[in-house]
């Protein structure tokens, strides 16, 4: 009820009375999950959020209401892009706020565009009583993890603080041939004076994996003919398949309360990240080809090295305050944001020659994969395959007007967004801009009841185009539009939220060409006809529309010893005159979007054993279509986790906490769905039954 969340442009606000849907995960909530990645921790309880990657795959991010948000698009302390590409670290996470829905006007436009959600991480700071905790954990199959959390405050009013966190994990996962080596370090130093608050953060994370990336590609082209999900221990690629992710972030943020009823905040941060290793794209066979004798097999494809670099500079400066015009209150805010991201991708000099065709029905995939050899060259091309810079500048204004003793609140505002994209490889630069408006309202007929609604937009950069005269232009950013209405009610020991939303996102032509510049899918494709009329790749065409209803409830029952939660989302994802990945117009449903997702959890502080807490979590994912015409769908599945936590105190400060859990108790075999651009459908094998045990000692 009293969760204070960071809403970027709107400042810190009460999550219960906010005019948008926002969920806060505090440090204890994240730590108690003991998920190996941040996305797995966040996605396990909210029905409108679905993880992709995480522990199951080295490609990492979240889906909000059916749309994708990559890990590199997460914000840290309000600074965009500071989490790092394919990041999984959580050692520095003090809290995480999920803002659901289109949010460009509130949070600013990501350099590469994002739709339907934002995630902001607040870093850990030293508590008033200090932080002193060490931990040791074991995760199946044979991973050992050590953690340390040391923090202290100094000064007469404890105005100075430092906090350091570390996590090391190494060993074999439950999946055959899949092992990881994870290192995470975080340092925070902060000053909190009467008016000025300043914080410095430094975060380093490196994750090395073997056998950790095995994603089945382009299932939509195989008419959905994918074999049944195997046991989660099964690896679709050999153990020599490897990827490393490394990232370093440094940032400085501040808040200053002036003598004139307004506050100034700002920050600057720099993140450098790298993702490198082998790139292999296993593909299901549609029918008999030179590579496959029948359908329902898959070919591993060949292996090639990839080396991807990301450099992001992020800064912001904002001011907010309050004044009155008669009986009407005004909470105003203004913000300037600037983000510069540089991307470069290098490839190996060539792909390997070895490949293998796998017959899943024969079993013993490891034996079949033995024919697939790591014969790829270990040399990299001297020139980048992708070399680009994206600059995003924006200026935002908003005013929240309070009427009727602030029980009726109307927020109006917008953000002017300027984008500059430079393709260094092609020596092309394009610029564009757009204004993204927002309108929000919240009505509080009583302190425990809130009706709210909003209209917001998300922006994504458009493509650069060069005409026959050599003039380079860039279309205005693509606009996705959201309408949302909801109601929250505090019943005392139970809080409920019901909301309905619609998000409409434009499609755009792929216009794929081969090395000779010819259209990949021939002159009979719908794009070929469009191009003949003067159209071009990247032009907007058709739309995808997600309409849904969410219901969430959580409570504190039995004298706050029983903590249940439940969430349900029903969503339709429709395509209308939407360009497919094969440059054909389609009408139908979007792939990899379960229509129904439900999640429930419970924690019980037992009365018969002081310090003992039992917990359970259930996740249900409805069937999801893997082609737009609904000819094939992955079946629904349910995951069940159970766990326990016991804390024994020794004196005033010392305490030992032992916790453990079994995830995927019934060892459910399932495909974890993922989406690519257009109507591309991907999937990875879900993780098998997993055990873990952890001991933390606080002193």
Where are these regions (language model features)?
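Structural signature of Gram-negative outer-membrane beta-barrels, strongest in the C-terminal barrel
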Residues: 190, 310-312, 329-341, 348, ...
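Conserved C-terminal beta-signal and adjacent last beta-strands/turns
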Residues: 308, 320, 331-332, 453, ...
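Acidic, small-polar-rich N-terminal luminal/periplasmic segments of exported/outer-membrane proteins
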Residues: 1-129, 485
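Acidic/polar loop-and-plug regions of large Gram-negative outer-membrane beta-barrel proteins
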Residues: 169-173, 186-257, 261, 270-310, ...
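Membrane-embedded beta-barrel scaffold of Gram-negative outer-membrane proteins
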Residues: 255-257, 263-269, 273-281, 452, ...
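Gram-negative outer-membrane beta-barrel transporters
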Residues: 404-407, 504, 525-627, 696-698
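Face-selective signature of the C-terminal outer-membrane beta-barrel domain
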Residues: 250-273, 301-425
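Outer-membrane beta-barrel translocator/receptor signature
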Residues: 91-94, 104-185, 191-197, 248, ...
């Amino acid at each position: 009820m009293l969760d204070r969340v960071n809403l970027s442009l709107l400042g810190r606000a009460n999550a219960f009375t906010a005019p948008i849907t926002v969920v806060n995960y505090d440090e204890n909530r994240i730590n108690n999950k003991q998920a190996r990645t941040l996305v797995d921790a966040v996605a396990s309880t909210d029905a409108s959020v679905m993880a992709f990657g995480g522990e199951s795959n080295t490609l990492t991010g979240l889906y909000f209401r059916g749309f994708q948000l990559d890990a590199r698009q997460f914000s840290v302390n309000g600074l965009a892009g500071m989490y790092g590409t394919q990041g999984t670290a959580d050692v520095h996470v003090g809290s995480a706020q999920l803002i659901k829905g289109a949010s460009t006007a509130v949070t600013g436009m990501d350099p590469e565009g994002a739709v339907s959600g934002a995630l902001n991480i607040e870093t850990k700071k030293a508590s008033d009583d200090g932080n002193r905790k060490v931990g040791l954990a074991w995760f199946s199959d044979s991973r050992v993890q050590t953690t340390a959390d040391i923090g202290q405050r100094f000064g007469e009013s404890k105005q100075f603080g430092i906090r350091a966190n570390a996590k090391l994990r190494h060993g074999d996962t439950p999946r055959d041939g899949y092992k990881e080596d994870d290192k995470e370090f975080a340092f925070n130093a902060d000053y909190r004076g009467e008016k000025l608050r300043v914080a410095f953060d430094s975060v380093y994370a490196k994750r090395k994996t073997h056998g950790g990336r095995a994603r089945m590609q382009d299932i939509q082209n195989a008419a959905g003919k994918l074999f049944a999900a195997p046991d989660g221990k099964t690896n679709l690629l050999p153990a020599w398949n490897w990827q490393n992710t490394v990232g370093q972030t440094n940032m400085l943020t501040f808040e200053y309360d002036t003598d004139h009823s307004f506050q100034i905040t700002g920050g600057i941060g720099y993140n450098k990240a790298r993702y490198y290793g082998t790139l292999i794209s296993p593909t299901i066979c549609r029918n008999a080809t030179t590579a496959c004798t029948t359908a329902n097999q898959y070919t591993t494809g060949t292996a090639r090295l990839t080396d991807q670099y990301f450099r992001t500079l992020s800064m912001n400066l904002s001011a907010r305050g309050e004044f009155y015009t008669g009986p009407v209150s005004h909470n105003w805010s203004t913000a300037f944001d600037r983000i510069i991201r540089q991307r470069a991708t290098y490839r190996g000099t060539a792909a390997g020659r070895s490949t293998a065709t796998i017959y899943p029905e024969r079993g013993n995939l490891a034996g079949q994969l033995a024919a697939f050899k790591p014969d790829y060259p270990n040399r990299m091309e001297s020139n980048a395959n992708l070399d680009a810079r994206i600059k995003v500048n924006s200026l935002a204004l908003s005013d929240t007007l309070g009427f009727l003793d602030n029980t009726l609140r109307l927020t109006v505002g917008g953000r002017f967004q300027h984008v500059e994209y430079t393709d260094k490889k092609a020596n092309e630069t394009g610029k564009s801009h757009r204004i993204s408006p927002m309108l929000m309202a919240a009505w509080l007929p009583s302190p425990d009841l809130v009706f709210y609604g909003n209209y917001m937009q998300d922006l994504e950069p458009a493509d650069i185009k060069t005409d026959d005269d050599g003039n380079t232009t860039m279309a205005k950013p693509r606009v996705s539009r959201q309408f949302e209405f909801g109601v929250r009610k505090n019943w005392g020991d139970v809080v409920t939220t019901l909301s309905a939303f619609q998000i409409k996102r434009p499609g755009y032509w792929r216009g794929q060409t081969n090395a000779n510049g010819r259209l990949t899918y021939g002159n009979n494709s719908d794009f070929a006809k469009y191009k003949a009329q003067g159209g071009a790749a990247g032009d907007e065409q058709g739309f995808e529309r997600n309409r849904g209803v969410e219901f969430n409830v959580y409570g504190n029952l039995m004298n706050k010893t029983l903590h249940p939660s439940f969430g349900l989302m029903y969503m339709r994802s429709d395509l209308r005159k939407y360009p497919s990945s094969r440059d054909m117009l389609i009408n139908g449903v979007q792939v990899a979007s379960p229509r129904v997702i439900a999640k429930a959890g419970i924690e019980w502080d037992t009365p018969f054993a002081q310090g003992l807490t039992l917990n359970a979590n259930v996740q249900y994912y409805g069937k999801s279509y893997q082609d737009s015409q609904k000819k094939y769908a992955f079946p629904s599945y349910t995951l069940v986790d159970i766990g326990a936590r016991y804390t024994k105190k020794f004196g005033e400060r010392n305490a030992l906490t032992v916790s453990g859990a079994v995830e995927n108790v019934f060892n459910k075999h399932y495909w974890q769905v993922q989406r690519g651009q257009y109507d591309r459908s991907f999937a990875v094998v879900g993780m098998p039954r997993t055990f873990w045990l952890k001991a933390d000692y606080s002193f």
